[in-house]
């Protein structure tokens, strides 16, 4: 009989859910059953929730499908019994359409279920766009795991990515997106990662849709020192947050009416920031002489009060600024006031942790353009997923991007689709890549005419159309100065300005170009023979770029030919003239002196002269020329040109007017002391330059002499890494180090490299850690007068005291965000770890520094607004139909 009654109640509840689900809209919901087999219905209605789930096949182009072990299926809802797993590729991404600027709940479910029979749950990273969201470790998660976040997308496209970090295979079971109410879950900065969402009831059941119209998932919780109260009356929930009515019909009060009602949670990192949302409703019938009134305290400090819960209606009290918990222990207390006759109550509450996503996504127009190109040519490259440019280690094959600074979206500067099997005409979507410098469409099957729009792309320096089947006449406008156009192997393409023969036929471009190329080759050979006769040289001669704008010559496969060809070779007399006979010396080193100069009468340059007495200097000179001819990044000092004439060797750089970072820490030479926020930005920009050398160059480079005097500052205090004389290339293959003669600056030198002569990119990371410590402390790297002479030893000893103020530069006068300071200090010590394997990569360093900068900027913005701040640090939101009582 009891069993029949249970089944009847279950049937009634199921019918009620279906009825409510039909009444409540799922508009904007994305509910993906990942790995749903093609032979199963899609969409389908999940019976317990009434939610409509669909196959994920239309939202991702990679992966294989699997199913948890059959004996485990009864423990999970249907969507969690299947999964999509990703044995191929480093990063695999879902592409979802969302509403730009609106807060969304994003939730993923991961259930291993021993689908592969190996009994080894995988570990991998979860990304939201270009930023890390969570690390998923299913080794001990029998019931799986379910990370959730509140996030405001900056575009109408959202990418959720699984990133392989080890030997195991990433997988996903369910992916859900829910648009939230306007103006809810807002932060000063960053997104909100769910920590707790609980309602207070002795029931074991959890709540979600349709009880919660936003499909937030609520777990029940009850403490042994509490007493439950409840009501059968209808409770209004019509404020912006709309917690489930079911959650509001129960509440907790302390059993000891005089005691506080306490909720506690622990923080792994004491610097973590939290937002708290507490939901109250008076569900008891109070007598005329009864009053319920209490204050809310967070970590012993008044959070809000007094609180008088509204009768059978909702009030939500929330923090509008982030909160931290000293020592990592968080404590929320509700304490009755002196005039209250009843203990405090709490119906439900939510706690979220702030997570920063500092990496800006690639320019939205560029992303749209390159995805249109991908769709037009039906390109199916495994790594063409999510953001095209960032993180840099996942940049799409065939692209190069510029990262001007940490507050500007990356832009696409190179598109290389050579030998990609392209067919059809040259798509007009290319013209929307408005910062494109290099376009390579060679060795495909493209047809039609060369489009006129290419001539309107003023940023283009190189266009390679070789090896296609293009026809018609090349637009005359593509002969503009500074543009290199290559079109060999298009027999039906007609060169601009070519004349018809007497028979009325145009000369094909290959003949014209061959004659021109032959003539140039003869001139070059004569010139080389003449120069050899005149004076033999042990240095390779680099010939200047031909001035003819349109030539049909074989395409060079250098990574950045447009950049390399722009470097100008100067004569010694030109160097003498530009420096006014070396009249203004602005620096000096072991290689020689650096003089100020001007090119073309206006462009300021720094001329680095090689001393004839410097034997090491000549090797460094050649290394620096070789490196700077093939690298280009906004945070690396640009090479304007060079001089290589007999015994006269010089490098001509852009002039960086604000000197080096060391001067702006010490105040030497009257330089202003930079504040903490500027230091963090400079550090992040220098880190971007190093990251480019490590993973953006082919082959990768190690700087080998990172120090504060080699970080220069331009007129806007943008950081530019300089002095590449000791730089070395790495093999592209499996080896991650090279053996070299020890070189570098004492104090900054990687101790592991010093003892083993094995150089790797982690050697730069160590040096950068020392630079960070200098920026934080303004202490000398080596000071023999200190008890701990090396800066890492001194900082390590001071860390034992736990007082950041004793470590920070006194010239900052305490004007810094302590959270960002601690985080930067921990990062610096991690970089300067004696063991290279324990040091982070520069990509990780960049992310950490960006997050530090976001924290510091948030503090500065808040402090600037304190004088005009009209709203309290806590906000109270009432039932929309209720007028709050006066106090």
UniProtKB/Swiss-Prot annotation:
It catalyses: L-seryl-[protein] + ATP = O-phospho-L-seryl-[protein] + ADP + H(+); L-threonyl-[protein] + ATP = O-phospho-L-threonyl-[protein] + ADP + H(+). Residues 532-887 are cytoplasmic. Its main location: membrane. The chain crosses the membrane at residues 511-531. Glycans are attached at residues 143, 230, 256, 289, 338, 363, 400, 416, 432, 445, 464, 471. It holds the Pfam family Malectin_like. Residues 1-23 form the signal peptide. Its EC number is 2.7.11.1. The modification Phosphoserine is found at residue 739. The modification Phosphotyrosine is found at residues 653, 753. This is Probable LRR receptor-like serine/threonine-protein kinase At5g59680.
């Amino acid at each position: 009989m009891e069993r029949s009654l249970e089944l009847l109640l279950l049937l009634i509840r199921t019918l009620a859910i279906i009825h409510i689900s039909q009444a409540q809209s799922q508009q904007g919901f994305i509910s993906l059953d990942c790995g749903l087999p093609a032979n199963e219905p899609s969409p389908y209605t999940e019976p317990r929730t009434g939610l409509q789930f669909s196959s994920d096949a239309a939202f991702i182009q990679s992966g294989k499908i699997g199913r948890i072990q059959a004996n485990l299926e009864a423990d999970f809802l249907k969507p969690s019994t299947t999964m999509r797993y990703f044995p191929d590729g480093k990063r695999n991404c879902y592409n979802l359409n969302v509403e730009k600027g609106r807060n969304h709940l994003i939730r993923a479910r991961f259930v291993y279920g021993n689908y592969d029979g190996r009994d080894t749950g995988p570990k991998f990273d979860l990304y939201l766009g270009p930023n890390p969201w969570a690390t998923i470790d299913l080794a001990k998660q029998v019931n799986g795991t379910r990370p959730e976040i509140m996030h405001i997308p900056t575009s109408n496209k959202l990418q959720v990515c699984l990133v392989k970090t080890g030997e195991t295979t990433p997988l996903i079971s369910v992916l859900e997106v829910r648009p939230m109410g306007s103006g809810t879950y807002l932060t000063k900065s960053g997104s909100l990662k769910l920590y707790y969402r609980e309602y207070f009831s002795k029931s074991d059941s959890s709540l979600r849709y349709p009880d919660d119209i936003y499909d937030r998932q609520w777990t029940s919780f009850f403490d042994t020192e509490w007493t439950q109260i409840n009501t059968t009356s209808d409770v209004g929930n019509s404020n912006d947050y709309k917690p489930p009515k079911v959650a509001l019909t129960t509440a907790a009060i302390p059993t000891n009416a005089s005691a506080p009602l306490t909720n506690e949670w622990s923080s792994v990192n004491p610097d973590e920031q939290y937002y708290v949302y507490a939901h109250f409703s008076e569900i008891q019938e109070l007598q005329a002489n009864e009053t319920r009134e209490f204050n809310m305290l967070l970590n012993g400090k008044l959070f809000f009060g007094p609180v008088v819960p509204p009768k059978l209606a909702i009030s939500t009290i929330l923090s509008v600024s982030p909160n931290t918990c000293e020592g990592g222990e968080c404590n929320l207390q509700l304490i009755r006031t002196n005039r209250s006759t009843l203990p405090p109550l709490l119906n439900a509450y939510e706690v979220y942790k702030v997570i920063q996503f500092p990496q800006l996504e690639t320019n939205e127009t560029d992303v749209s353009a390159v995805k249109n190109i991908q769709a037009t040519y039906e390109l199916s490259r495994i790594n063409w997923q999510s953001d095209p440019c960032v993180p840099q280690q996942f940049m799409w094959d065939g692209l190069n991007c510029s990262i001007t600074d940490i507050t500007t979206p990356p832009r696409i500067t190179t598109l290389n689709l050579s030998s990609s099997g392209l067919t059809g005409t040259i798509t007009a979507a290319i013209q929307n890549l408005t910062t494109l410098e290099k376009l390579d469409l060679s060795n495909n099957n493209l047809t039609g005419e060369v489009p006129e729009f290419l001539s309107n792309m003023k940023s283009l320096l190189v266009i390679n159309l070789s090896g296609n089947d293009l026809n018609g006449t090349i637009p005359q406008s593509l002969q503009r100065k500074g543009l290199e156009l290559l079109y060999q192997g298009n027999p039906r393409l007609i060169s601009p300005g070519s004349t018809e023969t007497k028979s009325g036929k145009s000369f094909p471009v290959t003949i014209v170009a061959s004659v021109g190329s032959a003539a140039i080759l003869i001139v070059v050979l004569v010139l080389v023979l003449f120069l050899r006769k005149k004076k033999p040289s042990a240095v390779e001669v680099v010939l200047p770029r031909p001035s003819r704008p349109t030539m049909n010559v074989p395409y060079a496969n250098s990574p950045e030919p447009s950049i390399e060809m722009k470097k100008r070779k100067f004569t010694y007399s030109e160097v003498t003239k530009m420096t006014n006979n070396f009249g203004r010396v602005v620096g000096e080193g072991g290689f020689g002196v650096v003089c100020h100069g001007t090119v073309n009468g206006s462009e300021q340059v720094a001329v680095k002269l090689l001393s004839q007495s410097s034997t090491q200097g000549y090797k460094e000179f050649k290394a620096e020329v070789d490196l700077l001819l093939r690298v280009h990044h906004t945070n690396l000092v640009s090479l304007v040109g060079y001089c290589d004439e007999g015994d006269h060797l010089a490098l001509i750089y852009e002039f960086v007017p604000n000197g080096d970072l060391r001067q702006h820490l010490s105040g030497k030479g009257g330089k202003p002391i930079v504040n903490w926020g500027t230091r963090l930005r400079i550090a992040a920009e220098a880190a971007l330059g190093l990251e480019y050398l490590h993973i953006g160059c082919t082959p990768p480079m190690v700087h080998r002499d990172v120090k504060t005097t080699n970080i220069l500052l331009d007129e806007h205090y943008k950081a530019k890494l300089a002095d590449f004389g000791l730089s070395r290339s790495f093999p592209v293959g499996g080896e991650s180090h090279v053996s070299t003669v020890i070189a570098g600056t004492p104090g900054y030198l990687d101790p592991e490299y010093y003892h083993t002569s094995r150089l790797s990119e982690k050697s730069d990371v160590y040096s950068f850690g020392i630079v960070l410590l200098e920026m934080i402390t303004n202490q000398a790297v080596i000071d023999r007068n200190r008890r701990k002479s090396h800066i890492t030893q001194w900082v390590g000893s001071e860390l034992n005291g736990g007082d950041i103020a004793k470590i920070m530069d006194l010239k900052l006068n305490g004007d810094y965000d302590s959270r960002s300071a601690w985080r930067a200090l921990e990062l610096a010590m991690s970089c300067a770890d004696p063991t290279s394997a324990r040091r982070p990569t520069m990509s990780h360093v960049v992310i950490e520094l960006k997050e530090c900068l976001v924290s510091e900027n948030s503090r500065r913005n808040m402090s600037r607004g304190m004088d005009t701040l009209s709203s309290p640090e806590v906000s109270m939101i009432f039932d929309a139909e209720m007028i709050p009582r006066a106090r």
